[in-house]
Amino acid sequence: MKKKILFWILGIIGIMIIGGGVYAYNVYSSVSKTLDEVHKPLKRDKDSNGVETAKISKSEPVSILLLGADERGEDKGRSDSLMVITLNPKNNSMKTVSIPRDTYTEIVGKGKSDKINHAYAFGGVDMSVATVEKFLSVPINYYIEVNMEGFKDIVDAVGGVDVNNDLEFTANGHHFAKGNVHLTGDQALAFTRMRKEDPRGDFGRQMRQRQVMQAVIKKGASFSSLSSYGDVLTAIQKNVKTNLTQDQMFDMQKNYKNCLQNSEEIQIPGDGHKAADGIWYYYVPDAAKQDITNKLRAHLELTK
């Protein structure tokens, strides 16, 4: 769902500042404040003195964990969705891997195995990053976290979105007919969370998440939504976190955006069933996981 959110944010920035004059200055000032607010470094990003350590060089391949946090009220919740993307600006290509939330794996820092989405509940984004790195055997350079409960604010801020729905269903009091439908923030949240009535299960849910995000990107980057740019920035500020700095965001917008033109989506094969404890898990064969690891490491140009 979220693989383009960074480029969407920066695309809006680029459109809004071309007006020039005082308006452009005010917009840039608001954007700068928003990017400062969403910047949340990982614990490992700081040295013993609390100073952020250097990141990778410009124009080198990078990996990003896109994490949808299922936070409701005071409940920290679990990661509602996990997606890893790798970007290689040398050949302008991108690979994306959506990790099923029920995937059974070692939870780094807990000394046990569990569903991969439980890592967020146990140790927040730091433990999620470490667990995904262990699971895929690839380094994660950056993360972008979106509060899924507050994602509806972003949808409403751009005036709702239009998507093409391929499965008629009802969820959380909202009915979704087949065909083109317009979604408010609340409807978009229900639309992207449903999976039990979908024969494709979590994979169908992931597809709807991508649909909504792509619609948000298209709507948010259009001139018709500029009048509400303040609402958009407020929604981002409240619901997005990342360890990317402002400079890194602008560098990424400049050097990595063309990677979107050549995208490959990699699915994780496996088998879902109940374990002896009666809990449903998604099991990924070692050979299948190694194949994905090899693809990602090659794309990141990692030789060791």
From Swiss-Prot:
Pathway: Cell wall biogenesis. GO terms for molecular function: phosphotransferase activity, for other substituted phosphate groups. Residues 26-304 are extracellular. One of its GO terms (cellular component) is plasma membrane. Coiled coil: none annotated. Residues 1-4 are cytoplasmic. The chain crosses the membrane at residues 5-25. Its EC number is 2.7.8.-. The keyword Membrane applies. It is found in: Cell membrane. It holds the Pfam family LytR_cpsA_psr. InterPro entries: LytR/CpsA/Psr_CW_biosynth, LytR_CpsA_psr, TagU. Keywords: Cell membrane, Cell wall biogenesis/degradation, Membrane, Signal-anchor, Transferase, Transmembrane, Transmembrane helix. GO terms for biological process: cell wall assembly. It is a single-pass type II membrane protein. It comes from the Bacteria. May catalyze the final step in cell wall teichoic acid biosynthesis, the transfer of the anionic cell wall polymers (APs) from their lipid-linked precursor to the cell wall peptidoglycan (PG). Belongs to the LytR/CpsA/Psr (LCP) family. This is Polyisoprenyl-teichoic acid--peptidoglycan teichoic acid transferase TagU. It comes from Bacillus mycoides (strain KBAB4).
